Curated annotation (Swiss-Prot):
SUPFAM superfamilies hit by this protein: PRC-barrel domain, Translation proteins
Protein name: Ribosome maturation factor RimM
InterPro entries noted in UniProt: PRC_barrel-like_sf, PRC_RimM, RimM, RimM_N, RimM_N_sf, Transl_B-barrel_sf
Major site of localization recorded for this protein: cytoplasm
Gene Ontology terms for molecular function: ribosome binding
Gene3D superfamilies per the UniProt record, alphabetical: PRC-barrel domain, RimM
HAMAP family: Ribosome_mat_RimM
Family: Belongs to the RimM family.
Cellular compartments annotated: Cytoplasm
Swiss-Prot/TrEMBL GO biological process terms: ribosomal small subunit biogenesis; rRNA processing
Record's function text: An accessory protein needed during the final step in the assembly of 30S ribosomal subunit, possibly for assembly of the head region. Essential for efficient processing of 16S rRNA. May be needed both before and after RbfA during the maturation of 16S rRNA. It has affinity for free ribosomal 30S subunits but not for 70S ribosomes.
Assembly mode: Binds ribosomal protein uS19.
Lineage: Bacteria, Pseudomonadati, Pseudomonadota, Gammaproteobacteria, Enterobacterales
Gene Ontology CC entries for this record: cytoplasm; ribosome
Length: 182
């Protein structure tokens, strides 16, 4: 692991994964990827982590698939104790590296915090998380404090054209055709 900030610290940081538990005694770690294809996390370099409030560049020496897991070897991390210090560190890259999307495609990070409003004008709340279900993505919407239906959270499918009627990232607003009682 390099302590120098030679690679430029991300201007627009985005978390692409997390370092998991150690694997073996030679400094290998499990990696949990948030990318659609798990191995795609290795396409985005350089990696950074934050420790003690400071950015640190993480240089990969090697990676491989082991059973269902991805495991990595970080340069300069040669034993289990050193690897343990990296457990639970989020893997961060500069979001400028991410590819441009086609129309009606969105990065989840851009949807976070958007206000979700029905076509009738009812404010359902704000997007606090997204989930992948296999068939479609689902917005986790935290309801407003004075929700007329007593909801705390809603799960709203992200189905463009069916449920999603309009997405305005500039205004941080997603319009949906959805019954507020659900």
């Amino acid at each position: 692991m390099s302590k120098q900030l030679n690679p430029v610290v991300p201007e627009q940081p985005i978390v692409l994964g997390k370092m998991g538990s150690t694997y073996g005694i030679r400094g290998w770690l499990r990696v949990f990827s948030s990318t659609e294809n798990a191995e795609s996390i290795f396409d985005y370099q350089p990696w950074f982590i934050q420790q003690g409030g400071k950015w640190q560049h993480v240089e990969l020496e090697d990676w491989k698939r082991h059973s269902q897991d991805l495991i990595i070897k970080v340069k300069g991390v040669d034993d289990r104790d050193a690897a343990n210090l990296l457990t639970n560190c989020e893997i961060v890259v500069d979001s400028k590296q991410l590819p441009e999307l086609e129309e009606d495609d969105y990065y989840w990070k851009d949807l976070m915090g958007c206000q979700v409003v029905t076509t009738a004008g009812y404010e359902l709340g704000k997007i606090i998380d997204m989930m992948e279900t296999g068939s479609n993505d689902v917005m986790v919407v935290k309801a407003n404090l004075k929700d007329a239906f007593g909801m705390k959270e809603r799960l709203v499918p992200f189905l463009h054209g069916q449920v999603i009627k309009n997405v305005d990232l500039t205004a941080q607003r997603v319009e949906v055709d959805w019954d507020p009682g659900f």
